[in-house]
Regions:
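Flexible linker/context regions in extracytoplasmic redox proteins
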Residues: 1-137
Length: 137
């Protein structure tokens, strides 16, 4: 697990089982993207139930931000939920992310992002990964 994304980022959390927007007549949970997934309504993500994938979504690299003179961009991957390789490091953003200055390895990310991951490139605080913010030291 690489993040602690809440259910309400992709699903309406009901008060009751049969509430509108939870399970309709097809008995399949509805996908309704939340503020992190849509980057505060900047994006219009899509869900394709036939191939179990979502696209144009912040969580999988549909983002860009400026840091200093650099424009950092994600990969904007279309992730297939049944394919575990879709969530490996480097699928949502490059290692380092496109536009990042310098040459870095995954093990060096902690130099600026030590509240998120350790010197081995392992995420240590999942609440700070895929949270809609750039977490710098």
């Amino acid at each position: 697990e690489i993040s602690t994304v809440n259910c309400d980022e992709c699903h309406q959390v009901p008060t009751n089982y049969l509430d509108n927007g939870h399970l309709d007549s097809d008995n399949i949970a509805e996908v309704i993207f939340g503020s992190v997934a849509t980057d505060s309504s900047v994006l219009s993500p899509t869900w394709d139930r036939s191939n179990t994938s979502c696209s144009n979504i912040y969580c999988h690299g549909a983002f860009s931000f400026s840091y200093g003179d650099s424009l950092i961009t994600g990969n904007n991957s279309s992730v297939i939920w049944t394919d575990y390789e879709s969530a490996e490091c480097g699928t949502c953003h490059g290692l380092p992310p496109d536009g990042h200055t310098g040459t870095w390895t995954k093990q060096q990310c902690f130099i600026c992002h030590s509240t998120v991951l350790d010197a081995n490139g392992i995420i240590i605080d999942k609440t700070k990964h895929i949270n809609g913010q750039v977490d710098l030291n």
